[in-house]
From Swiss-Prot:
It comes from Thermococcus kodakarensis (strain ATCC BAA-918 / JCM 12380 / KOD1) (Pyrococcus kodakaraensis (strain KOD1)). Its main location: cytoplasm. This is Probable tRNA sulfurtransferase. One of its GO terms (biological process) is thiazole biosynthetic process. One of its GO terms (cellular component) is cytosol. Catalyzes the ATP-dependent transfer of a sulfur to tRNA to produce 4-thiouridine in position 8 of tRNAs, which functions as a near-UV photosensor. Also catalyzes the transfer of sulfur to the sulfur carrier protein ThiS, forming ThiS-thiocarboxylate. This is a step in the synthesis of thiazole, in the thiamine biosynthesis pathway. The sulfur is donated as persulfide by IscS. Belongs to the ThiI family.
Amino acid sequence: MFNVVIVRYGEIGTKSRQTRRWFENILMNNIREALVSEGIDFKKVEAKHGRVLVRTNRAREATEVLTRVFGIVSLSPAMEVDAELEKINKTALKLFRKKKRELNLEKPKFRVTARRITKEFPLKSPEIQAKVGEYILENEESEVNLHEYDIEVGVELMEGKAYIFVDKIRAWGGLPIGTQGKVVALLSGGIDSPVAAFLMMKRGVEVIPVHIYMGEKTLEKVRKIWNQLKKYHYGGKAELIVVKPQNREEMLKKIKELGKEKYTCVLCKFMMVKHADRIAKEFGAKGIVMGDSLGQVASQTLENMYIVSQASDLPIYRPLIGLDKEEIVDIAKKIGTFELSTLPEDEIPFIPKHPVIRGSWEEFRKIYMAIFGEEPRKRDC
């Protein structure tokens, strides 16, 4: 029934004409990539008057996939017809009846919303709304209600065509991936780090996922998490990078001998950031993403995050810093990573009973020198 998907974007529309065209082109490329990767045939993807039109006979399936493409605010599977009142009326009635059956309503309340994006059509928007609404009332048991409606019939007109729809499906918004550069995201296998990576993707950033190896069970879990996140990563090309640290056992043995086991978590995170820093520079990434939420665990106090941040001179982004655990879990459930994050994983045998809560850089520096025989790096800014 539907032959086109109307794609609406948000922030892109606030850009200058030249910048907007660049964003639109990246968005359209990401749309094409998403459809091809999901095996959905389409005839054309084009930008017109602040909209992107996806011409496909599988509009419902395409809409479901495209809700996961960042930069899109909402979508509508629609029927494109010539901008003639009779054709508009008949198509609107057809879609109204279909929606009425789906909702299983005998006398639905409805309204018609029309917009002339270009002005060739002789009737003004309120007149179109009145004509289409009148036609539906004459031919179908229904009631007009502009505020408390069951069905909204949308009509958009541009360049001699009318696009009629009855659904407006919300997407994630944000910016198209590929418009804001690259970052390395540390993925531990927990609930938080996938959400942090997701939120950076949402802002148009290509993510390079890095996992610091803890065991096969955890690695398998992280692979599943990344495969789920890739469903939102259209426009990004990176695959999971696994780092197997050398001499970790020796490092942990030495910190125990020093009687400074309370710094174990801070030291391990410091070393993780060092690995991420190396990979980020290798790939030309402009920062490192971590799933820290302020005060959630001992290693995520301001003092301890300050120490960990010294391991790289790149910016360290913590998009969850102001979120409660419940808010993070809610996002994880929506994006499909929560259940995966709660799968069994390898036990971590070296977590101290009493981890340091407010670590000191000077004390950490002495521990680091005693273990590695050199000064830890300290960021320049």
